[in-house]
């Protein structure tokens, strides 16, 4: 489902880039780089989890769909609130959005906004994800949670036309450069849906 936004004012569209992928794929690092490059508002999706979700994950228990629904609506709502601000050109959100149905919730939460929504899927191998989560400090998502995320992961398919896939296997610098080049061109051309 690709949503065509409503734009009654014919003003330039704003952008929402949602950086998605399992724990350890580099969502926060990539989102901050995109936000900084474009001058967009940055929203850390992890900060929008209800306290119960954070406690559950901290104890090593994976979230289920019911745990995620409210969080996904919080993520979509936070983006919508930022888009309503006149001074905001765009938003960059981190959100795992592991399943297509999760991405569909984000799509539907923004469908009546004059904004172009694009997902940036950070593709990484199991080994890379475990290595990265093992080396993180002070984060509630531990390496053992990677398996539960990979078990439910529905990688974006070709019919999800609003998804940009970036491999992170060649290192941070190369993946950031590739991603920044794509989003910078897209925004500068103000591509309409």
Swiss-Prot record:
* One annotated GO molecular function: gluconokinase activity
Q: Which residues bind ATP?
A: 21-28
Q: Which SUPFAM superfamilies match?
A: P-loop containing nucleoside triphosphate hydrolases (SSF52540)
Q: Cystine bridges: which residues? A: none
Q: EC no.?
A: 2.7.1.12
Q: What reaction does this catalyse?
A: D-gluconate + ATP = 6-phospho-D-gluconate + ADP + H(+)
GO terms, biological process: D-gluconate metabolic process; glycolytic process via Entner-Doudoroff Pathway; pentose-phosphate shunt, oxidative branch
Pathway as given in its UniProt record? Carbohydrate acid metabolism; D-gluconate degradation
> Which InterPro entries does the record associate with it?
P-loop_NTPase, Therm_gnt_kin
- Please state what class of enzyme this protein is: transferase
A single Gene Ontology CC annotation of this entry is:
nucleus
Keywords in alphabetical order:
ATP-binding, Gluconate utilization, Kinase, Nucleotide-binding, Transferase
Q: Which family does it belong to?
A: Belongs to the gluconokinase GntK/GntV family.
Which protein is depicted? Probable gluconokinase
The uppermost taxa in this organism's lineage are: Eukaryota, Fungi, Dikarya, Ascomycota, Taphrinomycotina
């Amino acid at each position: 489902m690709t949503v065509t936004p409503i734009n009654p004012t014919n003003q330039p569209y704003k952008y929402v880039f949602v950086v998605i992928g399992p724990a350890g794929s580099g969502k926060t690092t990539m989102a901050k780089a995109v936000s900084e490059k474009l001058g967009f508002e940055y929203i850390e999706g992890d900060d929008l989890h209800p306290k119960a979700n954070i406690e559950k994950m901290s104890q090593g228990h994976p979230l289920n769909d019911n745990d995620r629904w409210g969080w996904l609506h919080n993520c979509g709502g936070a983006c919508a609130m930022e888009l309503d601000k006149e001074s905001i050109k765009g938003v960059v959100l981190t959100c795992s959005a592991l399943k297509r149905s999760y991405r569909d919730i984000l799509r539907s939460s923004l469908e009546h906004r004059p904004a172009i929504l694009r997902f940036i899927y950070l593709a990484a191998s199991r080994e890379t994800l475990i290595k990265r989560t093992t080396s993180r400090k002070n984060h509630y998502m531990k390496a053992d949670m990677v398996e539960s995320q990979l078990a439910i992961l529905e990688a974006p398919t070709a019919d999800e036309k609003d998804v940009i896939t970036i491999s992170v296997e060649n290192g941070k610098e190369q993946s950031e450069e590739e991603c920044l080049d794509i989003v910078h061109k897209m925004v500068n051309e103000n591509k309409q849906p």
